[in-house]
Amino acid sequence: MKKEILEVFDNTYPDRNYTIEIVNPEFTSVCPKTGLPDFGTITVHYVPDRTCVELKSLKYYFLEFRNAGIFYENITNRILDDLVAAMQPRSITVTTKWKARGGITETVTASHTAQG
């Protein structure tokens, strides 16, 4: 996954706290154990500081995971780390909610709050 794909633009209202919610209901990756596809919904909530993530670049970033063998927990934390690196938000939470596999569902949430 190439985090360099992520682009940002200047936040016009950096003095105001507001929350942006981004939902990708068609996220796909591959189970590293079975090689079978995994399907999930990725939700990102963040309070921007100086920059916001550009949605087209985020879409292409998410597509990078399509053929990657990676566990749910690692996907969630990788997305969080890459978004923090790209835009340094005041706060951000990434939640991944996975379709049932063998009758079991999983939801993973990872968060970050800027220091200072």
Swiss-Prot record:
Give the residue range of the signal peptide: none
The molecular function GO annotations come to: preQ1 synthase activity
Per UniProt, where does substrate bind?
53-55, 72-73
Which GO cellular component terms are attached?
A: cytoplasm
Q: What is its EC number?
A: 1.7.1.13
**Name of a matching Pfam family:** QueF
Catalysis performed (reactions): 7-aminomethyl-7-carbaguanine + 2 NADP(+) = 7-cyano-7-deazaguanine + 2 NADPH + 3 H(+)
Keywords, sorted A to Z: Cytoplasm, NADP, Oxidoreductase, Queuosine biosynthesis
Specify whether Cytoplasm is a keyword of the entry.
yes
Q: Does the UniProt entry include the keyword Cytoplasm?
A: yes
Listed pathway(s): tRNA modification; tRNA-queuosine biosynthesis
Entry similarity comment: Belongs to the GTP cyclohydrolase I family. QueF type 1 subfamily.
Function per UniProt: Catalyzes the NADPH-dependent reduction of 7-cyano-7-deazaguanine (preQ0) to 7-aminomethyl-7-deazaguanine (preQ1).
Q: What is this protein called?
A: NADPH-dependent 7-cyano-7-deazaguanine reductase
Q: Which organism is it from?
A: Chlorobium phaeovibrioides (strain DSM 265 / 1930)
From which lineage does this chain's organism come? Answer: Bacteria, Pseudomonadati, Chlorobiota, Chlorobiia, Chlorobiales
